[in-house]
Swiss-Prot record:
Residues 104-415 form the IF rod domain. The gene is KRT37. Residues 416-449 are annotated as: Tail. It comes from the Eukaryota. GO terms for biological process: epithelial cell differentiation; intermediate filament organization. This is Keratin, type I cuticular Ha7. Pfam families: Filament. Residues 268-411 are annotated as: Coil 2. Residues 252-267 are annotated as: Linker 12. One of its GO terms (cellular component) is cytoskeleton. GO terms for molecular function: structural molecule activity. Signal peptide: none annotated. Residues 140-150 are annotated as: Linker 1. There are two types of hair/microfibrillar keratin, I (acidic) and II (neutral to basic).
Amino acid sequence: MTSFYSTSSCPLGCTMAPGARNVFVSPIDVGCQPVAEANAASMCLLANVAHANRVRVGSTPLGRPSLCLPPTSHTACPLPGTCHIPGNIGICGAYGKNTLNGHEKETMKFLNDRLANYLEKVRQLEQENAELETTLLERSKCHESTVCPDYQSYFRTIEELQQKILCSKAENARLIVQIDNAKLAADDFRIKLESERSLHQLVEADKCGTQKLLDDATLAKADLEAQQESLKEEQLSLKSNHEQEVKILRSQLGEKFRIELDIEPTIDLNRVLGEMRAQYEAMVETNHQDVEQWFQAQSEGISLQAMSCSEELQCCQSEILELRCTVNALEVERQAQHTLKDCLQNSLCEAEDRYGTELAQMQSLISNLEEQLSEIRADLERQNQEYQVLLDVKARLENEIATYRNLLESEDCKLPCNPCSTPASCTSCPSCGPVTGGSPSGHGASMGR
């Protein structure tokens, strides 16, 4: 793209404003007007148009020149007093008479090349836009793939570990229950041992009491036997004394007196003693039987009382054991329920933490995706604006091309000769005057539009 700024002044007094871009459009020979029309117009049409409308002719709205002329278009007009306009510009005044040089085809070719370059530029930008969209889609997919990696294996590992932890907790709970059951069984056996010890002590006490009674009975029997022996000895002593007394009396009396008395026969002492002995033996036997019966009755009563007490004690102990077992079972169940409650609370806390973390990750991912979406929308809006700008540029360039073509066609009809072919024919180019059907400013306005 080639353009330059010109601040040279025209001999007629019109000065190009600094910054006004003088773009040479076509390599058409300058047609200088006759000397009589030199005071009417001496300025180039395109320069007047650019200077009057303050429009950068041939430039894009982006501030870049869109016209690149061949080197032949930069040769100055050899006529003295001209506006320093290149000599191959085909329009030098508004009153030319169908005069065109031999560069018309080159100019049209240049304009066509310019249009082709612009269309190529548009196609290139569209292709770049499509490539950018493809790149954005790929990057969004890659970003999704990087932002959302596959955590399924980790999740499976975590689930397996959680299952193992739950199994371990259940095994621990089962072992705790077994330990509690063993403790309860040990307590039961300890209670049974204590009850057996108490029963053994009771039996030992009963045995001691019975042994004491038996000893008392044995002592009573020994006393009775001693009394019996003493009575027997007394009987024997009495008998021996009686016999001795009888012998003494017989010895004292001798045979002096023989007195016969008609008396009843004497009582048989042996028989009497035998009867007494039998009576005493019967009494001893009766007393012994009575003592034995009393001892048996007392023993049976005490044993029955002990048995009833032991039965009542066993019933109470069995009830106590049942109640203790029930209490222990309820305590174990309560502990198991507490353990289950703690496990469920821990699982709930872990699930809440895990889902809270996942929710935070999802929210961060959503925020990232929303930011990316906003960036993509901003990029799309920017590209759409650039595309609209390019479409506007395209429309303006097409309008410029149409304007240039109309100008070329009108000047082709208006310039009949080339008075600038010889240096001596004219000394200066007349100023551009009014033309039928419009002015250069009007053309500039149409170009600006």
